[in-house]
Amino acid sequence: MAEFFATNLWPLIIVIGQSVLLLVLLLISIAYILLADRKIWAAVQLRRGPNVVGPWGLLQSFADLLKFVVKEPTVPSGANKGVFLLAPLVTCVLALAAWAVIPVNAGWVIADINVGVLYILAVSSLSVYGIIMAGWSSNSKYPFLAALRSAAQMVSYEVSIGFVVICVLLCVGSLNLTAIVEAQNSQWGMLGWYWLPLFPMFVVFYVSALAETNRPPFDLVEAESELVAGFMVEYSSTPYLLFMLGEYVAIVTMCAMGTILFLGGWLPPVPYAPFTWVPGIVWFALKVLFMFFLFAMAKAIVPRYRYDQLMRLGWKVFLPLSLAMVVIVAAVLQFAGLAPK
């Protein structure tokens, strides 16, 4: 044991430091992304949105954080207390764990593993367990029904996302996220990114990501008219905050995945000066914000789907379309001699 720490202590300290720094930056960015979500929703409805706490309401999210932390957590009398309190922690930790392999710039990644895409798909699939645990342990019919809805919804749309990812992997020949970004680097700039040749898959990914993260118009899990607040109806205080945090981290993760798969990651839209002078992490952040803007606009202007419409879209439209695109992309790459070696 002593020999292990003698040879691996500094690498371990560096990884822990990187993880803490990423966690802090991610949580701060989530605070302002949540504020932007509320501001966009307010602008569409011709309102001002949060504008009291701090200049232009910039400290509103931190005030909400303080409110949640100081409130007393309550556990229903018939609930399974251990599972009830563990569920939000599982959801939040799994959402944060995905960022261990996401590169925000060339070489700026905690773990540059060769199966990064597979890792993210696996972690995002596990997040449904936190929701199932919350629904079952609450000992209430509304959270349990919402948890069952969420499980069916997430499983349905993960299939489509998987086929979308396969289309990109066929073009790249690698599961490494850094390799996917570098494969889009060309003299054509943004016209060489995969959003253009794989545009149908970009649309499928965007809509499936909305459903995967339970965002409007697919927020059937939190349908206020039917299920009150969904699987979170019995939660308050810090456990509720962890659920909200996990939800928004998952949304930003999907935005980052869309950026890496289709929008060139940290690559500039025009591969010439002065665009190349801008740091890659700035381009990455701007593209993630663009993806989140699409998420926010869908929440603001699209009415909620019925549950049968949601399932029909996933199984009868997206699944055949994405499967057909996998076959078409593979055939085109093979016959055109463009398949990666």
Swiss-Prot record:
Annotated membrane topology: Multi-pass membrane protein
Transmembrane segments: 13-33, 82-102, 115-135, 161-181, 190-210, 248-268, 277-297, 317-337
Single annotated GO MF: oxidoreductase activity, acting on NAD(P)H, quinone or similar compound as acceptor
GO biological process terms on file: aerobic respiration
EC number(s) on file: 7.1.1.-
Entry keyword set: Cell inner membrane, Cell membrane, Membrane, NAD, Quinone, Translocase, Transmembrane, Transmembrane helix, Ubiquinone
Catalytic activity: a quinone + NADH + 5 H(+)(in) = a quinol + NAD(+) + 4 H(+)(out)
Residues of the signal peptide: none
Cellular compartments annotated: Cell inner membrane
Pfam family, one: NADHdh
Quaternary structure and partners: NDH-1 is composed of 14 different subunits. Subunits NuoA, H, J, K, L, M, N constitute the membrane sector of the complex.
HAMAP family per the UniProt record, alphabetical: NDH1_NuoH
Function text: NDH-1 shuttles electrons from NADH, via FMN and iron-sulfur (Fe-S) centers, to quinones in the respiratory chain. The immediate electron acceptor for the enzyme in this species is believed to be ubiquinone. Couples the redox reaction to proton translocation (for every two electrons transferred, four hydrogen ions are translocated across the cytoplasmic membrane), and thus conserves the redox energy in a proton gradient. This subunit may bind ubiquinone.
Protein name: NADH-quinone oxidoreductase subunit H 2
